[in-house]
Amino acid sequence: MSQGSAPFWETTPLAQMSQAQWESLCDGCGRCCLHKLEDEDTGEIYHTAVACRLLDLETCRCSDYAHRKQRVPDCIQLTPADIPAFHWLPPSCAYRRVAEGRGLAPWHPLVSGDPDSVHRAGVSVRGRVVSEDEGDPLETRIVVWPGRDV
């Protein structure tokens, strides 16, 4: 970014971003990789502290990103076409923030220049979740914090 020019997330609509720009918006918090439950009657989404088995609980990144859809068929791959449905993403999510015109948070790696800032700010799931491989019933692991803005 040259001095005086606005960053791409402030000038380029989500639907017009390059693949590299789109991917770089992910802050690496891991919240979208947590299992969620939906109330059949109200449609309300409940977050759990149970992560997809492919989520590396230390780095908060997918351990097999290139093949995640083959290994986890119900993995949700975010694309610009999904923008109208971003309401299920945590309010802190960069995709949702940009879609809502709120810009990136100060702790976002694109703003801070530090990929670990998301962890230091307490936004990531690091140290707060278990893998689905532990076998706990999701209903026993419902938590509120992933759905809160930070």
Swiss-Prot record:
Domain of life where this protein originates: Bacteria
Family designation: Belongs to the UPF0260 family.
Name listed for the protein in its UniProt record: UPF0260 protein Tgr7_0887
